[in-house]
Amino acid sequence: MLKTPETEHGIVNRVTGSVFAYQGWPSVCRDENGVLYAVASSFRTEHICPFGKTAMYISKNGGQTGTPPIVINDTYLDDRDAGIVYMGHGRMLVTWFCHPAEVYETQYYNPIKNSAQPSEAGPSLGMLASYRHLPADRLQGGSFVRVSEDYGVTWSETIRLPVSAPHGPSVLDDGTLIYLGKELYSSTCETPEEPG
């Protein structure tokens, strides 16, 4: 007989009173002290928008409560699909990816314009219009990681990777990272299909 684990449901963090209240695709890990670290693409207006930031939430009581969002990554692009893995001794790795600005300007422009609430359309379309004034190196998409050596207090510079997976790598028993993902916005990769 299949035994159902005991669960408790509740809300640990909810953003209210802001057009940037959408938070999506969380990942969580736990350190040797039982502290939970969750990351998500936060401060968004909707599923497809130009605003996502990688935010971390820390819980020291098993997920009953958590810190307010701590922004650990905020590029000019939409930082999506944050992943986190704990590697031991205070060391953790966060992953995310960004579509290039060109994808938003071509493939996602109309879906954003047509699906956004009126209060979201202005900021979203304004952000897309600002891309033409930014340096080209800030508008390239890709898959990225940052590493913390001090339980998420500080983070390394951004490291670009050729693959992406929504929740990042896993740690093997010997401490080696294994990262199975899809090639995304590397020099030999194509852009994604247009949303349906």
PLM features per residue range, with description:
Residues M1-G196:
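Asp-box/BNR beta-propeller blade signature and adjacent active/binding-site loops
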